[in-house]
Amino acid sequence: MRKIMLNGQWELAEAGNDRLCEVQVPGSVLSGLYGAGKIEDPFYRTNEDVTRELFRKDYEFSRTFVAAEDILKEEKIILVCEGLDTLADIYINGQKAGSADNMHRTWKLDVKEFLHSGENQIRIVFRSVLKYIEAYEYEDNKEIHYVPCGGMKGNQLIRKAHCMFGWDWGPQTIDAGIFRDIYLEAYSHPRIEDVKITQVHWDNAVDVCTTVAVSGNAVDKCQVRVTIQEDAESVCGHRTGANDRKTEAHVCKVGETVSANNNPAVLTSSIHNPKLWWPNGYGDQPLYKVQVELLDEYGTVLETITKRIGLRTLTISQEKDLWGKEFAFCVNGVKIFAMGGNYIPEDCIYSRITPEVQKYLLESCKRANFNCVRVWGGGYYPSDHFYDLCDEMGLIVWQDLMFACNVYDLTEEFEENITKEITENVKRLRHHASLGLWCGNNEMESAWDHWPEVQSESKYLRADYIKMFEYIVPKAVRAADSETFFWQSSPSSGGCFDDPDDENRGDCHYWDVWHGQKPFTDYQKHYFRFCSEFGFQSFPCLKTVESFTEEKDRNIFSRVMENHQKNPAANGKILYYLSENFRYPENFRKLLYVSQILQGMAMKYGVDHWRRHRGRCMGTLYWQINDNWPVASWSSIDYFGRWKALHYMAKKFYGPQAVSMCMDGDIMQVYLANESMDAQSYQVAFYVKNMECEILEKLTGTGTVGVQESAPILAVDVSGWEDKKYEIFLEAEVTLADGDVLCDVETLVPYKYLELDKPEITAEVEEQGDAFVIHLKSSCFSPFTAIGFIDADVTLEDNFFHMTDGEEMCVRLDKKDIRNGEILDAADLTQQMEILTLA
């Protein structure tokens, strides 16, 4: 097979008009215009309003390429477009070769008849989706009125990432373009059409069944060879006879063959003493390479497809128990407590989503002790690279299909389109070790059940929902992947409008803290089986705000700051919660900092509670991990990759072992959650300290917490400190057998009432090979101490930490964690460093 890449330099123009500029493909209208200096940064100030209007026009991308004579001799020449956004007409040498209408699909067109020897032209016209929506004609009684928060009317009529039309955390950047690879494939031989890999686990062995479908002429003369390797060394292979589908599996050192005349060809290989794949925190992530080769009658390799798999069983357990039915990921027979967050598209301009960006975000998840990420259904299906990284890092993927918070008009054309979309993406992703479940949609069953603005829609649209998500979608998923657990919606109790928000079954989304302005303590009233969404907003750091504002804009109620806040009344909510917990900050920068502390406290409150009730609750996925532009939002990592306080706190509250405290009347209970596969012996010390960090009371204890157990380890009556509650804080310190020390701090009154002194913090920096170590001392209790840097972006080993005694505290910065700038030496780090404190 010959491959001609068409990435690189293209020309961008308004359709039918002169050239505007060059654009690098993968690229888009916005990336091209901004890169050429034709428009300002789309994210700066209120430029969103300007860029939105650009997409009332049609645009075209064009370039030339050379097709050599030997290419034209091939029987098939296929144009492969892995990402066209969205309504596109493709022309080769002025002749229309085909059209596309779904950014979630790969489009393949046979273009041989349009090519000639020498220079050829390809032109792709992207039609305005806004004009398409305006011209859309509904059937009688099926006009859709519902619009998602922050979105645009009609967004659900197009198979385009819904959040590109705006969301309550994202702008209306309705971009268009070629956002993934585009290339030609020329060949005359049969091709591998599909590879499906399934596993059967039995006594210390795994049977790997590889099903290979082949298309083209002379298939009966071809052979298929499958080789399974780990670390580049073959561990097994298997051959079946030309007419056999099953034989006894055996281990051998070379890949062996089966006739492709059995189409599909089925090969079963057996791996004894397999190395099992585990989620992060439960074991290693060994991967096996499955290489599938198509050979002609002479043994020449015609095509090779390689997929990486992990050997594991992975499903959702829904066993009945005394509370209802559990909802827990079960990996290799072990029920795990899912800890993670919701992942949205990494950028509004999709061609800027690089493997490096994905790797950084997922590494940040792993470093914060995540074992699960939910790919949310209002965005897009990430690249193969994303799932490869999740496989490597042990991050279970809760995979939504791309339907979210919407009402759909189910026409015949729409049904055909989404069925192909689902089939293609399920086949593409089904082999990944990290794939935990398929979910039909986000919040749509719940919306039809009790959202008034959705319930008021036509009964015919409700019928469309039932047909789509009870029949069409699950049928398409199961036809392509019968192995992976399917869940109709999130939240849900299993579909069919059977009380989708039932706390005792399925998964739940909980938003009374935040949208309902309930206090953090409200989390303790709920015992969800699996909380797949809950969240709290914060502002990004000052450096991020400076990227999209002028100095005059730096007030949270300015026009620009409100433009970069897409949730109505959210800034007021932040101030409300701030007033409940903290004194009003003295300046704008401090306000941003305190908002992040609030966010971290809220999420910690919920996660600590649910981890204390492991067994009843078996998962927490907070909303949300990342941003797609610089904005005030629920994210724990901002658009530029800067960790907020929440992400540093998550590293602790999602730790394999985590200590927490909660009040029960006059008793302060200290809990230790252990999610590891080993029992944990501990020593616990409980302190009452004053603002000078002097110990007023100390209690100790020892014990062991079992495997995957959460238990109270110390109970302290604190009623005797009522008269001193404004002058003290409480600290629990747990030392594990391996020497790790875990700490938690609580107060008896909100921080706003504490008589905090202004801390004097000294900092000395030492360079130690590949790292810097920051040595800190504080003159008094300094909660939520934060270290920032003027120029470089860094990820510290710890941040937003409590300084609870006069002893030296050390914070490590690995040099590899310095980004977007440089730190030359210890003196330079000292000069760039800024320390923020609550008092």
Can you say where each PLM-predicted feature lies in the sequence?
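Active-site neighborhood of glycoside hydrolase catalytic domains
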Residues: 392, 409-496, 640
